[in-house]
């Protein structure tokens, strides 16, 4: 295969190999210039073959995609077609780059941002190989024109009054740089003001700008003028009339039954509506005899769509009659129900070269509108199974080493079941979740532990980017159903396990806040913080009854209860690197502090690292706390949890071909104890030991994007374990590997 990159370049063309540094002239450096500069460079940017991270300036000396294209694109064999389609990249030709057109686009962009005297020129720079060329751009900006004044002209009196009342919200101010985008935004703002006050038919295009750049040097005097000729309905305020609600189970369904109220009609099929009308009315802000408001329309559409009940939602507004005096819009809301049931499966698989292997799965079904009130009923079962594939571990003669299974039932109500907050305006429909769950943890040859829990949770959202979740009551009970003599010996050797795995109640309260940046952000961020506490209100009751706060052995239903405070946080940021690659950074941390009735937090509440979504070079609970390590198979995976956790991940994701993506990653972290339990040596957190006690792993992976979910395969390789000295201290390459199969991204 020839490695020539110019063998298929047409005689009258050249291969584009990048830009030279763009030269800027005749400008004043300020914030406006820097913002415009970014837009100009985006307009002029063109990635050559083999571009490094999508750069227009730097390229790899090995443009393998172009080489493959040159070698196979002209062949008609099946293999050649597959190679070309999967790996080949056609040459980026100068004729396709079209620098003349790009210079014109950049020049128009400058003028739309106030640089009316700008000029963009280009130069084609032929390389040593005459079939290759770079492009050099020179950008001359000239004076920046600023806003002198803005007048609103020719608007009807009532509309003019609305303009005057909203002048404090105007986006155009004297002295601001001239920007077409701001002018358009101001025109849209006025349109929203009008449409939120009854002017249903008003559109931004019914007003236009006139600009005077001559009267005052380097400034623009603006007039926003209402059009002389517009449809009659545009000048009129409109009120909502009758409301018709159509509920269909399919798009083509003909409705034959109805319920009629004074201003409200529901059309459906059957003896009664498939959905209680109050569920829709609660989210419908447009009401009969009220002025039309576009914000109310948007909020209604968002909330009704957000219930998840419907696959199609459509609003239609129709004038009641055609007379010039008509000011009433009858509204028809058409809703088509989504399929009532959802069936889902989640799966993962972990393999460890030291001998642990096992799958895990969640299988569930959801029922929408379960009781005609918009409720969502969800039932799922889950399980994981792990066995020993090696022959050196204690208990390896057993075919089954451990398994876990459980079930969850939850009911989500589309409202807050609270006596207050009823008039608060939410971004999305809030919800109340009632949940019950049960799980069994079995460690073959050691114990079987049962955890049952119930919770009440409120979800609410005030803005598009922030989600709140508050659980005022979570009641959890953990108890042993079976324990072998061997595990009894382990417990006697390890007082820490004796405390953390004791039978106990865990009455909790929890609050979480989640921030997700808008979808329009090129480099989005995600941040979540979760705060929870256990038994403090219960202990206050004991305190009122005369028992000391720090006294031990207080009970709930004749069983001891746990008492602690816990905080967790999770942060990730994604940087776009080209069109099909990303760099993702992730940090998580957590702390739990036990006090009062507890010496140590329950085992299920403690932190651990390792696994498919953590430090992928190591198995779950196989690292920490601190520099603690045991070679005993009897206690490994049981006591390797901690009170304090730090974890950081860096992952680069890139497209290989089609929907198949590759990844390379670096994971670091550990857990530590905050109290000396007298058993797990070197487990306490100390700042001076932070770096050497941080586990480190790297690896590569594959992701196959099926649009609705992602299949992920990660191969992790250990670099550093906390319990040995030296940087690379893995005993052997074979023992420092883990293979994980999972669904979804790790963060």
Across the structure, where does each feature detected by a protein language model lie?
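C-terminal outer-membrane beta-barrel translocator/porin domains of Gram-negative envelope proteins
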Residues: 262, 266, 270, 350-354, ...
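Amphipathic hydrophobic-ligand
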Residues: 115-120, 200-204, 357-361, 405, ...
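Conserved C-terminal beta-signal and adjacent last beta-strands/turns
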Residues: 646-654, 662-664, 668, 695-706, ...
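Outer-membrane beta-barrel domain signature, especially the mid-to-C-terminal portions
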Residues: 540-542, 635-637, 677-695, 725-732, ...
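Strand-loop-strand
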Residues: 349-352, 367-369, 414, 678-706
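Gram-negative/organellar outer-membrane beta-barrel architecture
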Residues: 162, 273, 293-528, 616-617, ...
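Interaction-mediating elements
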Residues: 4-306, 315-318, 326-328
